Structure formats: structure tokens, C-alpha cells
Amino acid sequence: MQDTYRHQGLRKRLVGELRNLGIKNEPVLKAIEKIPRHFFVEHTFEHDAYENKPFPIGRGQTISNPFTVAYQTELLELQKEDKVLEIGTGSGYQAAVLAELGMQVYTIERHQPLSLKAKKLLEGLGYGKVKTYFGDGFKGLPAEAPFDKILITAAAPEIPKELLKQLKIGGLMVIPFGEGDTQQMIRIKRLDNNEFEKETFDYFTFVPMLKGIED
């Protein structure tokens, strides 16, 4: 698969659309303009990869639409070389955005085929420093904690307590919360060992966050 001038032009158009939708973070927009999203979607959807749409990637999972990726990334308020844990690798696109922004990225996926595919793709695109893990996202990565930021890319029916424990004091977690057809984006800041501050944002639609693993 190639990344052509046509693809680059479509990415520029997409970035303009994201600006119009309210995304203001220039580094995030530049990352989206650089990363070839058509590499991360199934071949069937390649020609539509730069539409602001989600697409199925197998195993009942999706690649989020670019606005959602930009929105969540913006809410993280990333600082240089933040250590970021992503729950739900999926296609690997969100991890690529974080890596392009210069973050230390740890990403975990409960579906082994998706995890292996994302790892190979990220390495092929020059994002080999991203650390990919096959495992249960509800458990996080306690051996690698604490994290400056934690990003959940699936709808959580509850705030995972194990993940809160893995957040640095002063750190932020961004999570779509709820079990209905739409979920509210929430940002949680850890103020102290047992004290957290919660902010609420817009509503989105995500696949559910599930416990356990699938080979």
C-alpha cells in the first residue's frame, strides 16, 4: 500500500474539517495530517479512509472517526514525553497519533489478532517505540505504572479502579462513560492518593469496554 499525493490532499481536507468542528490543538492536527489513516482500515474502506467516519476493523471493533481521536487526544492536555497508557489498541491509529506527538506510548488490546496486526503496522510506519500488549484493559499495566495520562477508547460501564491506581498524582484519564447508545466523555484528574476531580464533556458512541481476553 502506498501513501500518495492524493492521500495527502485528502488528509489536508480532513484537517480543515476537524478545525471547523472545533479542534484547535495544532500538534494534534499536524499528527492527523501526517499519519496515513488508510493503512489502518480494511481494504474495503480504503477509499473512504479520510471521511470523518468510524469503520469496522474486525472482532466487533472499530477505528474511531478522526474527530473523536482528535477530541480525546486534545482532552489529554499532553506534555512533552508524557507516559501514556491507551486502553483498546484496535487498529493502532490512536497509538500512532500519540507516538507522532512524541509521547511514550503503552497500549493494550484484549483481542490478540488485532494486537499483533497493530504492532506490525506501527513498526512498519516507524512507530516501533510504541509498546503493545495483549491483555485485559480493565487491569491496565501495573508493572509499567504510574502513567501521566490514561486514554480509554471503549465505553466503560464503570470507572476502572485498577486504572485509577495507575494514574500519577496530577495525571489525567479520559474515558467515555456509560452503557446506553451514547456515552459521555469524562476527564478525571488525580489530585491525591484517594482524591479525584471529574469533568464532563460531549457525548459520543463507542463499542463497549469488556473484561477478559480473546485469542
Language model features by range: what are they?
Residues M1-L85, Y93-V97, L101, L114-K117, ...:
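Class I SAM-dependent transferase core
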Residues E77-E197:
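Conserved nucleotide-cofactor-binding alpha/beta core module
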